[in-house]
Each structure stands twice: as C-alpha cells, then as structure tokens.
C-alpha cells in the first residue's frame, strides 16, 4: 500500500532528470573540495613534524615499497560469466592456459635462467681446490631435477594449447563445431604459445653457451665412474648408484644436449586413441599460419622503430611458432620464411636474457634445413656480413646516440616534472590524463630503446669476441646512467605516478567501454538471430563486464580473448577497431607501468660485463664535473643482487654476493677512492709547501681537476650499506696525518695546517689528532735527545743566561734551537717520569766522560807539567801578589802542541776543552730538564685557584654519598692535584744528586792525580778564549763551518768539576782572572801611550796596526770577562760559597735537628697516653 500511495508523488522525477544531475555534481564538487582541504591540512601537519617528508622519494632510501599492480581476487570461473555456456568454456580454457604460460615464464625468468647463468660464479680459479667442481655440481643436481620437471610441464602445456586450438578449428565438415570460428582469430593464444617456446629456446641457448656447466658435468660423471668401481670405499650402496646414473643420463639427454626446444616440437601431437587430429587438420594449419602472419605483420611494422615495445621478444616467439608449424604440418611458406630472415638485416641479434644473445638466421637455418636449401648461399652469407657491419656502424654512432638520448631523456624528465607538478584542472581533466599517459609511455619507450642498444651492443661484442674501444665503453656506460635516470625519475615521483596511473586506467577503461557499447548497440539493433551473432554479443558483454573493475592481468587477458570473438562479423567499423586496439595496448602498458619500467631498466646483464667498470671509474675520476652519476652506476650494479639469490651451486648464495661485493669494492678503491685520497693528500702537501717551489702548479699549464665535487655527493648505496666518499677520504687523511705525526711529532704544525686546508678547500671535517703538540719552532724531542745524548752534547752549544741550546752546524737553512718550552711540551707528551730517566742517562754518559777525563789527567806529560806549575806558583806567589802569571798559562797552551796535534789541527788541550764543554752541556741539559719540568707543572696547575688550600674532592664526594665510580674519579683527581702541587713546589735537586754521586769518588786518595785540575784551568781558559774568538770571527765572515757565538758548556763543565774536586778555594787562590785583567789593561795602556807618541809623527800604517792591536786586546779582555761572568754564574748552581767540609758540617747539623724533633714528638706521645686512658 505504501508503494501505491507514494508512487504518484514521485512521478515528476521522470521529468526532473537534469536538476538531479546538477545536484549530484555539486555534491561531488563539495566532496572534492573537502578532500583537497583535508590533504593540504595533512601536508601542513607533515611539514610541521618533519621537513624531509615530501612527494619526492629518495631512490637510496626506500623503507616503504609502493606496488601499483592490482591483484585479482576472483577466479577465472567467476570472471567469465555469460549466458553463453559454450563460449564461457572456450574462453575459460584459453585464459587458464595463458595464465599457466605466464606463470611458467615468470618461474623460468627468475629461478631457472639465473640458476643456470650464475652456475660456477663466485669462485675464482685461484680459490678453487681440487674437487670443488664436483661438489658444486653435486649441489646443483637437485636444481637440474627441478628444471627437468619444469621442462616436462612446459611440454604438456604446449601439447594442451595445440590440442585446444585444433579442437576449435576442425576441418571435418561432419563433426559439430564447438563455436563458429569463421573470422575468429585467437591471436593472444599464439602469442602466449610463442612466449613459452621462447622460454625453452632460451634454456637451450643458456646451456649451450655455458662451458663451465658442461665441464663440471663431465668431471662429475667421471667421479661417479670411479665411485662405481669401489662403492664401499665411499660408503654408497651399489643398488642406489644404478638408478642415479640412469637419472643423470636422463637429465643429460633432456637438458644438456641442447634438445629442450627440439624435443618439445617433436612431440606426438596427434592423439593416438582417436582424439584430436592435429597434423591432418588443414583448417587448423591455415589458422595457425594466418595467426603467425598477423602477429608478424604487427611486429615487422614496429621493429627497430622508436615506438617499439616488446616486438623483439614477439619475433623470437614467431620464429619458434614457425618452426613448430613446420614440424607439425610439414609445409613451408618460402616467401614468409624469407621475410623472417629479412628481419635479420634490421635486427641482427636479439638478447634473450642477461648475456645470452640469439641469432635468428642461425636458428631458422638449423631448425628448418629443408627451407634453408631453397635459399641461395649468398643471401645467407650476406646476413652474417651485415652483422659485422652493424656492429661497426653501432660503434661509430654510439657517441651520437648518447648525445641524442641525453637530450631526449633530459627533456622528458622536465616534462615529467612539469606535468606532475602542475595542478589538475577539473575542466581539462581528461586532456591532462591523456598527456600524463603519453609522457609515462614515452619514458618507457626511451628506456626500451636505450636498454636494447646497450644489451645488443655489449653482448654482440662479447659473442663475436671483438675488442671494445674506450670511447664505446664510456658511451655505453653513459647510456646505462640514462637508463637508471629514467627509473629514478619514475621512482622519485612514485606518489604522483601512483595517483595518476589509477586515474589513467579508469579513463582508458572508460574509452574502451564506450567503443564496445557502440558495437554492442549495433549488434542488438540487428534483429536477425544466429548462433554466431549470439557469440559476438556474449563476447562483447563479457568484455564489458570484465572491464568494469580493476585492470588486472587476468581481466585484460579475458577482454583480449573476448574481443577475438567479438570483433568478427564486422561488429566494429575499421575506424573504431584501431583506436580500441590502441586503447587496449595503452591499458596494458599503464597497468603494468612500474613492472615494465623496472624490467627494461634492470641492468643485471652488467654482471657479465663488469670488466668495463674500471674504465668507467677512471673516466669519472678524470671528469669529476658530473661525479653524481656514480649513483646511477651503483644502482645498476645493484640490480644483479636479486638474480644472484637464485644461485644454487654454492653452500649459500651469500658467498656469491660477498664475492661480488668484494670485487666491486676492490675496483672502486683502486680506480677511484685510493687515487682520490692520494691526489687530495698530494694537493694538500704541495699547497702547504708552496714556499719550496717543488713543481709548476699553474692551472693554465698543468690543468686542474675540481675534486671537491666528489665530496658534495650523497653517500652511494651499495648492497646493505652506504659508500661515503667524503668519510672515506677524511678517514684516510686522518689516519695518515695521525700516523705521520706520531712518527715525527715536530711536524704536528704542518699536518694541522693541512687539516685546516682540507676543511677550507674540500669541506672535509677532520678529527683533531689530540697528540701532544710541540712549540711552533720545531725542536728535538726529550726522548730523542736522551737516547742520543753523546751526539747531542757534541752537536749543540749551551747558552747559560737564555737557557737555550743552539745547533753547532746544519745543512739546513735554519739552525735548530731547544728551549724550556720544547722541553716542557716533551715532558707533557711523555709524562714527568721522563725527567728521572733523562738524569739516569746523563749519569751514564758522565761516567764514560769522567773516565777519559781521568786518563788525560793521569798522562805522564800532563801530570808532570801540572806538578811543575803548582810548584812554580807556590814559589813565586809571594813575589807575584798571589796571582798566577799569564805567561805561564800561555806557555802551557803553546807547549802542549809539541805533544802532537790531530789531522784537524787540534792539540790535546783543545780536545780536553771539548771534553769539559760536553760535560758542561750535559749539566746544562739537566738544568733545562728541571726548568722544563717546573714549567710543565706550573702550566698544568695554573687553573687551581689556591695551591695552599686545595679542596679534598674524595671527602666531598663521601659526604654527598655519591656513586662508587664518582668516588674513584674524585680520588684520581686528588692524586693528580697533589702530584702537580708537589712537582711545582719542589722540583728535584738534580745538580746536588749528580755532585753527591761523583764527588766521593773524585776526592778519594787513589784519584789524587785529579787534584791537579785547578792548575790546568788557566791554560784551558786561554785556549777557550782563543777558540771562542776564532768562532765569532768566522760568524762575521759568514763562514758557517765552525762558526758560533756561545759555548757556556765550558764554564758549566769547569764549575762542576771544581765542585766535584772541592777546589774552588784552590782555584780562587790563583787569582787568575785578576792576573788576566791586569795583563791586558797594562798592554792596552802601553798601546794607547804609543799611539799618542806616533800620532805626532803621522805614520799612518803604524797607527792602523796599533788600532788593530788595541781592538784585539779589547776583544780578548771582553771574552775573558764574559767567561769570568759565566763561570761565576755556573758556580752558583753548585754552591761555590761552601767547601765540602762546610757542607758536611751543615748536613750533620740538619740530621741532629731532625733526630731531636722526632725525640720530642715521641715524649709528648708517651706523656699523653695516661690522659687518654
């Protein structure tokens, strides 16, 4: 009742159709607006959370994969539903067979091709041990068994396809037809059958080209033979061996003899038990031939053209089908056979997979020798000659091709960016989708063309064993980069492409549905009934229903099969049919866009041509301008990995991957990274040492590479890691600079400068070495001096006042100096323990020197002379005002030369002076060590606010009840602080130690001969002054050999030895320096007096001589004065104010005081005890 009452009120809706449509559009627009606003809101949230989130995907980081390929949930029986049951069955059977073929093809391409191709890889000849070949083959048998089962299944499918097609096209006039087949051509079925034949043919080619596989197989058979002779030795039962050998023979016959394809086409297609007749079925033979021609016509038109998609693969299928047709029906179309061979002029070779290249002419001649005889030899020979010329032409045009494709691909990328960035307008939505569809397909076509050029050229070179020029290699590598650039482009814009693809497929489906509905209306409008018309209508309805849904492979296959039936009886006009076919092709491409692009851009074949990689890297290094292309090449090299995972001849495919990884990384290191490291290091070194003018670095003459571009590269992804060129070079430089600085610490400043330069010039963030540095004036290290103290004291001169050592002579431009800061830095480097070690070394050195000193003093000539001098002085001292006569010292100095001189002209006294200087230098070094130690300690302690009141950190930590680790740290800090405080406050009395250790020995009665030392000091000083003046004169004359301006080691040595012998008073009693002063002053006065006399007589020559004499006397007096001051200063270090007896007395008094204070302390403790109790 309710319906009846309502219906009149709703009657007006029939008229109001237009308004309802407008209303729906408004709602749709509002919904669209809402979605847009919501999207932009989400985008704003994303931007606020993270800058890196965006529409552009990074090829190196793909944690999320976006798969666009729709997955069919319904079964074929559910999809193929029409009222026409017979048609349903036909389409279902054919669709099921096509799906089966696709699955077999996929399994072959992923599992079996790769398993066979990679057999024997991953082990070099050097690493192969005897027996490895047999072990590999042993592991591989199970794979061959699986391949055998696969091939058998392929044979069954081929047989079934032929039977199903033969059953439909019956030549028997009496037998009932399943459906009317006039004008029905299931071209799709033949294409799929061709694909399956291609798989079998490819397996044959792979095995035929695989020498390693065949060799290992032969070795394995030999192994079995030897096992067969003595099975018990190998622990194998004999009854198990025979079936295994039979099985191997079966495998060999089926797979390894190159008969996989041949055995398939030689099957018995005619059913023996009166089933389907094939070879006698003329209708089927005609249909078969017609379909081959139709496919060929389509293929021939596109082959070698820019719009080529998969025509090459189809051509291989056509050749397979042609051979199968000949095998079954034994008829041959000579004209068509010639047409097939003519294609070889366009396409001389086809890559089946990886590095397997196939020559159609060889195949057709070999498989149909009867037809080959009909052709003249010349034309067959011409094909082979053409192949050579094709390769030559290709090599010449490669560079040109690269340039062209560079422009094409670049402009295509710009189109992609612009079309995908442009906002879609609703009023031009369809047009926009068409544009996008065309740009996507154009990208795929470029990928196909480039991929074909690379594979064909590289594999032809390899197959014909012709050498490639470097130019060709570089050009091909550039094409590989372009190929990966196309793939990257699609990947980068994955989000937008995914969005567009779904819209484009819907748009194309809509176009196809429109064409089909027009044809369907035409069929329905024709009122004549026939079964054929019913089939056509059912097929069109099926196509319509299937198109109404996702564009899956199964649905597109069903539409294709349905249209094979639906296009008969001129249901479509010619101008309608072609656009429909174009739309269906586009739908195929767009629906599988991602997969097809991936397949075309897959560079797995590079594994077999990896010999080009070193040449490529050399080119990248030489032309650093576009270093970023490395990303593309590594992306291409990475493509081999999925294929390698199907290797079955090793314990695990990981071994093969590791081997490949190692090989590529070694090549990369050798041809790029190591060269780059060396070049950068060289550049930094030369830049830092420009003042040395080592070589011409004028960029206009030598040329210049901007290697900094390598460091702006993002890390390159390879396997499961990133190769960071910047990090690699930085690490190399850090390691090199660190190691070289540890070897020569004084070079730290140079390496520090090089680090700064690396940061400025190349942007490398270097790590500080944190090695204890030295001062900028690069001096010797304490450790070095300590180990070579005997060399040091002879090569360096000491300056007492400035406390500095200066190198005596050097071949360098500058002389080395060593001062307190050097020593302090060295002590900081090695720790304060080095100070005591140094003093110990000095003690060892002094011991040796004092032994020589003693020998000299003991010498008869010297000793007798010295005793004479002592006696003489005692006799004349009262007359001579207690002064040692200058003449006596001069006489000694001259007289000693009579004892002999060295080849260098040195007397014994000169050598003795040098010995004392060396002893003094050693003592000067000890003094410097002590000063350096204090300097180092005070530097370390300078941040402690009050040395008198240092906080005890351990106690503070205990009070706060902090963790054990903190307590330990506080204890360490306290210990360090107390050490530093003690070191800076005290400083060890090394001089006192060195006096105390030698003095007792020197003062013993057995060394009485040393007591004469004080009397040799006057002639020694005289000798020293003469030597010193001579050195300074050389300095004035710029004669660097023997030049010097200081040698306070002598004064230091004299002061030290006098202290050891306790002879300060004896030496002072000589009043030697007073005697010298008097002598020179007297002479100066005499000269001055003479000058006054001579100035009246105006004898210029005589005046000049007198001036020179006066100057000489002044210089000598000045030198003696300097020596006197130095000796007085040196004596202070050894407490010259006290004699040995006075020092001993002082020592005793101190000891007694200590004992007394200790005694008082013990008494007070005893008296305190009772109180405590």
UniProtKB/Swiss-Prot annotation:
GO cellular component, one term: early endosome membrane
Coiled-coil segments: 1135-1161
Transmembrane segments: none
Region (Disordered), start-end ranges: 1142-1173
Modified residues (N-acetylalanine): 2
Entries under PANTHER family matching the protein: WASH COMPLEX SUBUNIT 4 (PTHR31409:SF0)
Function: Acts as a component of the WASH core complex that functions as a nucleation-promoting factor (NPF) at the surface of endosomes, where it recruits and activates the Arp2/3 complex to induce actin polymerization, playing a key role in the fission of tubules that serve as transport intermediates during endosome sorting.
Subunit relationships: Component of the WASH core complex also described as WASH regulatory complex (SHRC) composed of WASH (WASHC1, WASH2P or WASH3P), WASHC2 (WASHC2A or WASHC2C), WASHC3, WASHC4 and WASHC5. The WASH core complex associates via WASHC2 with the F-actin-capping protein dimer (formed by CAPZA1, CAPZA2 or CAPZA3 and CAPZB) in a transient or substoichiometric manner which was initially described as WASH complex.
Protein name, as recorded: WASH complex subunit 4
Organism per entry: Homo sapiens
Lineage: Eukaryota, Metazoa, Chordata, Craniata, Vertebrata
């Amino acid at each position: 009742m309710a319906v009846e009452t309502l219906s009149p009120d709703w009657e007006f809706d029939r008229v109001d159709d237009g308004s309802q449509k407008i209303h729906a559009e408004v709602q749709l627009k509002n919904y669209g607006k809402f979605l847009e606003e919501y999207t932009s809101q989400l985008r704003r949230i994303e931007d606020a959370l993270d800058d890196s989130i965006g529409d552009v995907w990074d090829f190196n980081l793909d944690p999320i994969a976006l798969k666009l390929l729709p997955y069919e949930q319904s079964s074929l029986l559910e999809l193929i539903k029409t009222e026409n049951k017979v048609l349903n069955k036909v389409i279902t059977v054919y669709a099921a067979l096509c799906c089966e073929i696709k699955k077999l093809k996929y399994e072959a391409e992923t599992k079996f091709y790769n398993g066979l191709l990679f057999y024997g890889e991953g082990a070099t000849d050097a690493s192969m041990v005897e027996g490895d070949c047999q072990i590999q083959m042993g592991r591989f048998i199970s794979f061959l068994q699986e391949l055998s089962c696969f091939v058998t299944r392929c044979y069954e499918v081929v047989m079934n396809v032929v039977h199903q097609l033969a059953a439909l096209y019956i030549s028997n006039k009496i037998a009932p037809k399943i459906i009317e087949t006039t004008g029905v051509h299931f071209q799709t079925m033949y294409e799929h059958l061709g694909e399956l034949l291609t798989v079998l043919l490819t397996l044959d080619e792979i095995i035929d080209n695989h020498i390693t596989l065949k060799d290992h197989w032969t070795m394995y058979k030999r192994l079995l033979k030897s096992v067969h002779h003595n099975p018990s030795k190998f622990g194998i039962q004999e009854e198990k061996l025979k079936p295994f050998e039979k099985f191997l023979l079966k495998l060999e016959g089926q797979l390894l003899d190159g008969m996989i394809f041949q055995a398939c086409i030689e099957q018995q297609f005619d059913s023996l038990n009166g089933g389907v007749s094939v070879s006698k079925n003329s209708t089927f033979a005609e249909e078969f031939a017609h379909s081959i021609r139709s496919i060929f016509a389509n293929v021939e038109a596109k082959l070698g053209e820019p719009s080529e998609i998969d025509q090459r693969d189809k051509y291989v299928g056509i050749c397979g089908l042609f051979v199968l047709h000949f095998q079954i029906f034994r008829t041959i179309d000579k004209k068509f056979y010639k047409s097939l061979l003519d294609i070889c002029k366009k396409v001389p070779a086809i890559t089946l997979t990886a590095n397997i290249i196939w020559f159609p002419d060889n195949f057709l001649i070999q498989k149909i020798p009867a037809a080959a005889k009909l052709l003249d030899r010349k034309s067959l020979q011409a094909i082979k000659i053409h192949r050579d010329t094709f390769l030559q032409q290709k090599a010449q045009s490669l560079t040109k091709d690269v340039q062209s494709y560079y422009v094409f691909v670049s402009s295509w990328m710009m189109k992609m960016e612009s079309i995908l960035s442009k906002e879609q307008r609703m009023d031009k939505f369809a047009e926009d989708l068409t544009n996008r569809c065309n740009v996507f397909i154009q990208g795929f076509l470029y990928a196909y063309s480039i991929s074909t050029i690379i594979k064909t050229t590289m594999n032809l070179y390899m197959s014909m064993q012709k050498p490639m020029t470097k130019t060709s290699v570089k050009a091909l590598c550039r094409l590989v980069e372009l190929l990966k650039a196309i793939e990257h482009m699609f990947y980068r814009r994955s989000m937008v492409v995914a969005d567009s693809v779904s819209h484009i497929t819907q748009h194309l489906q809509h176009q196809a549905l429109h064409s089909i509905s027009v044809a369907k209306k035409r069929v329905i409008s024709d009122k004549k009934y026939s079964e054929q018309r019913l089939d056509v209508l059912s097929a069109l309805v099926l196509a319509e229903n299937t198109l109404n849904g996702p564009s899956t492979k199964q649905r597109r296959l069903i539409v294709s099969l349905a249209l094979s039936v639906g296009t008969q009886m001129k249901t479509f006009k010619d101008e309608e049919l072609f656009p429909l076919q174009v739309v269906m092709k586009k739908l195929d491409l767009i629906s599988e866009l991602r997969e097809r692009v991936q397949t075309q851009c897959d560079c797995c074949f590079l594994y077999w041509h990896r010999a080009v990689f070193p040449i490529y890297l050399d080119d990248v290094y030489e032309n650093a301008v576009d270093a970023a292309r490395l990303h593309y090449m590594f992306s291409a090299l990475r493509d081999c990995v999925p294929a390698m995972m199907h290797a079955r001849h090793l314990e695990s495919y990981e071994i093969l991957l590791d081997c490949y990884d190692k090989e590529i990384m070694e090549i990369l290191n050798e041809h790029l990274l190591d060269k780059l490291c060396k070049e950068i290091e060289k550049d930094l070194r030369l830049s830092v040492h420009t003042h040395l003018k080592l070589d011409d670095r004028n960029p206009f003459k030598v040329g210049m590479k901007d290697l900094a571009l390598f460091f702006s590269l993002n890390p390159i992804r390879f396997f499961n890691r990133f190769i960071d060129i910047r990090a690699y070079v930085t690490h190399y430089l850090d390691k090199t600079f660190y190691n070289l600085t540890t070897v020569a610490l004084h070079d730290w400043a140079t390496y520090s400068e090089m680090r700064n330069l690396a940061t400025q010039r190349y942007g490398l963030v270097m790590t500080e070495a944190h090695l204890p540095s030295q001062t900028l004036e690069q001096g010797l290290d304490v450790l070095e001096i300590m180990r070579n103290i005997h060399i040091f004291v002879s090569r360096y001169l000491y300056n007492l006042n400035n406390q500095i050592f200066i190198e005596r002579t050097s071949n360098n431009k500058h002389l080395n100096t060593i001062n307190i800061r050097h020593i302090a830095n060295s002590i900081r480097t090695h720790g304060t323990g080095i100070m005591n070690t140094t003093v110990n070394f000095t003690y060892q050195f002094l011991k040796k020197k004092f032994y020589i000193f003693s020998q000299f003093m003991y010498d008869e000539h010297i000793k007798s002379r010295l005793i004479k001098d002592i006696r003489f002085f005692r006799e004349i001292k009262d007359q001579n005002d207690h002064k040692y006569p200058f003449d006596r010292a001069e006489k000694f100095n001259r007289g000693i030369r009579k004892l002999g001189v060295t080849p260098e002209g040195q007397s014994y006294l000169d050598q003795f002076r040098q010995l004392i200087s060396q002893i003094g230098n050693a003592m000067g070094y000890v003094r410097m060590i002590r000063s350096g130690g204090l300097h180092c300690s005070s530097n370390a302690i300078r941040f402690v606010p009050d040395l008198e009141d240092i906080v005890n950190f351990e106690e503070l930590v205990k009070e706060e009840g902090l963790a054990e680790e903190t307590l330990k740290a506080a204890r360490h800090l306290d210990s360090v602080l107390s050490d530093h405080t003690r070191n800076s406050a005290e400083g060890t009395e090394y001089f006192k130690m060195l006096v105390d250790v030698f003095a007792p020995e020197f003062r013993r009665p057995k060394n009485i001969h040393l007591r004469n030392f004080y009397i040799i000091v006057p002639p020694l000083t005289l000798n020293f002054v003469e030597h010193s003046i001579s050195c300074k004169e050389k300095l004035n004359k710029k004669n660097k050999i023997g030049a010097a301006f200081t040698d306070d080691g002598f004064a230091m040595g004299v002061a030290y030895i006098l202290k050891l012998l306790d002879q300060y008073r004896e030496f002072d009693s000589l009043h030697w320096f007073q005697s010298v002063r008097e002598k020179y002053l007297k002479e100066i006065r005499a000269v001055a007096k003479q000058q006054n006399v001579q100035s009246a007589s105006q004898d210029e020559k005589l005046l000049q001589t007198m001036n020179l004499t006066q100057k000489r006397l002044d210089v000598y007096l000045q030198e003696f004065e300097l020596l006197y001051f130095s000796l007085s200063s040196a004596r202070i270090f050894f407490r010259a104010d006290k004699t040995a007896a006075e020092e001993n007395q002082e020592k005793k008094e101190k000891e007694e005081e200590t004992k007394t204070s200790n005694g008082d302390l013990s008494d007070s403790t005893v008296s305190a005890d009772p109180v405590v109790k």
